[in-house]
């Protein structure tokens, strides 16, 4: 009898020891804000006391580089971010691992016409996201500004100095927003609209969080953001509102198992939790305010909360993640050289163009109109044409490893040329607009 008791006890101890050996830390690499990650961390750890979630916060571009640089066995366990093209990059380089058992069968196959999950099963939609504009209602009232409805509204003269955006090279969600406009309007027309809006910008921030924070506290009037920034501000009680323009897209924010991670089995448990009914319900927390992947009849959604399927039906852009990924480096680099690093000159040109436009509306002048059109063309035309971004040889230059001395020299030369040309164009545009206003 004693031997049986001992044997049972020994087995229990061994089982316990085995459980302790399996229990450990799951490292989650993410660009998401603390309000979201901490909510999931606490809820999951409460259900799984033997597992600790470690959050490693980096922007999307830095996250990709981080995973690529680490050897197998030392990588984070999970990648969790909004940018679908980032997951395409990791999948193509065999840095993701399939985890089909983590999916929730209640989730739809598509959002609108966009697949929720990777067809190869390497990453999965965990939430949904659209892109639009948030604004501070008190700020707009104080400055007598109407709430914007479409991207084009932000290019109007009355919005000069009232708009904020983060740099797409530093924010994956902003890159998606910029790419959505470019895909919706077309390359050339899209850049014209972007540059007109950016001429009205008060700031281009380093991190995406700075834009909603600035709108929430009244520093900026309007922010170009991913939807959850605007919705989180609204449902947390700030005097803000949010709208999806017609030229938007709804795409999944994804979660994936990183190949060569340290704790695959327990990482899968966390992934499954984020897509479970309990995990999806967390998205309605006012500080999170994201769109779930599960149908609303399986959840308790707040009154008047946006329904992603309805937003997707109204959205005019069928987002092409492959196209976005192919020209990612070109778009982000161009934006920095034409906008981020030349904002002061672009603002000056835009201010002069607005002034000349007002003067010529009050007092029409053919020569002035001609000069103003020249100014607009100089200020609001992309330095790289659509033919270039369809050229694989041109795109390949930007895909190469920048640590290579020759590659770095080539790219730096291109970027310096763009920066110099942008400055020259903006300064010439300002002078032409001033001439137009003086006639």
Region roles according to the model:
Residues 354-439:
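C-terminal non-catalytic accessory extensions
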Residues 134-139, 250-264, 282-283:
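A bilobed periplasmic-binding-protein/Venus flytrap-type ligand-binding module shared by bacterial periplasmic
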Residues 35-38, 75-76, 81-205, 209-216:
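Extracytoplasmic ligand-binding site segments that recognize negatively charged/polar headgroups
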Residues 85-89, 216, 221-239:
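A ligand-binding cleft/hinge motif common to bilobed small-molecule-binding domains
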Residues 74-81, 204, 221-226, 241-243:
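Paired acidic/hydrophobic, glycine-rich loop segments that form the ligand-binding mouth/hinge
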Residues 193-198, 235-261:
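Periplasmic-binding protein-like
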Residues 258, 263-266, 271-325:
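Mature extracytoplasmic/periplasmic domains
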Residues 24-89:
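Early extracytoplasmic/lumenal segment of secretory-pathway proteins
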């Amino acid at each position: 009898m004693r031997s049986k008791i001992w044997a049972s006890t020994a087995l229990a101890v061994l089982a316990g020891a085995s459980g302790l050996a399996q229990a450990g830390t799951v490292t989650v690499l993410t660009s998401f804000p603390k309000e979201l990650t901490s909510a999931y961390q606490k809820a999951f750890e409460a259900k799984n006391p033997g597992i600790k979630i470690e959050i490693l916060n980096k922007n999307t571009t830095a996250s990709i580089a981080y995973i690529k640089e680490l050897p197998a066995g030392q990588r984070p366990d999970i990648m969790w971010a909004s940018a679908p093209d980032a997951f395409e990059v990791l999948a193509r380089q065999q840095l993701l691992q399939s985890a089909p058992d983590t999916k929730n069968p209640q989730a739809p196959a598509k959002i609108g016409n966009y697949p929720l999950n990777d067809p190869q099963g390497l990453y999965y939609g965990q939430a949904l996201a659209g892109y639009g504009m948030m604004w501070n209602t008190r700020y707009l009232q104080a400055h007598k500004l109407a709430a914007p409805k479409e991207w084009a509204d932000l290019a109007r003269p009355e919005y000069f100095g009232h708009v904020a955006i983060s740099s797409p090279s530093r924010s994956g969600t902003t890159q998606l927003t910029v790419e959505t406009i470019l895909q919706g309007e077309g390359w050339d027309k899209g850049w014209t609209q972007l540059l007109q809006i950016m001429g009205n910008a008060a700031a281009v921030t380093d991190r995406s969080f700075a834009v909603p924070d600035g709108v929430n506290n009244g520093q900026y009037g309007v922010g170009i953001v991913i939807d959850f920034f605007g919705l989180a501000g609204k449902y947390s009680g700030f005097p803000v509102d949010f709208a999806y323009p017609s030229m938007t897209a709804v795409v999944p924010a994804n979660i994936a198992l990183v190949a060569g991670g340290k704790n695959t089995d327990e990482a899968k448990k966390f992934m499954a939790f984020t897509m479970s009914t309990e995990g999806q319900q967390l998205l309605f927390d006012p500080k999170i305010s994201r769109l779930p992947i599960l149908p609303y009849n399986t959840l308790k959604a707040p009154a008047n909360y946006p329904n992603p399927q309805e937003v997707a039906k109204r959205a005019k852009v069928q987002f092409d993640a492959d196209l976005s990924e192919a020209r990612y480096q070109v778009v982000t680099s161009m934006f920095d050289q034409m906008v981020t690093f030349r904002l002061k000159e672009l603002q000056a040109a835009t201010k002069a163009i607005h002034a000349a436009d007002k003067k010529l509306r009050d007092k029409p002048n053919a020569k002035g109109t001609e000069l103003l059109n020249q100014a607009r063309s100089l200020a609001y035309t992309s330095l790289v044409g659509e033919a270039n971004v369809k050229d694989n040889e041109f795109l390949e230059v930007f895909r190469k490893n920048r640590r290579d001395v020759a590659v770095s020299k080539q790219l730096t030369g291109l970027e310096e040329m763009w920066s110099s040309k942008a400055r020259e164009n903006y300064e010439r545009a300002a002078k032409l607009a001033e001439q137009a206003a003086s006639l």
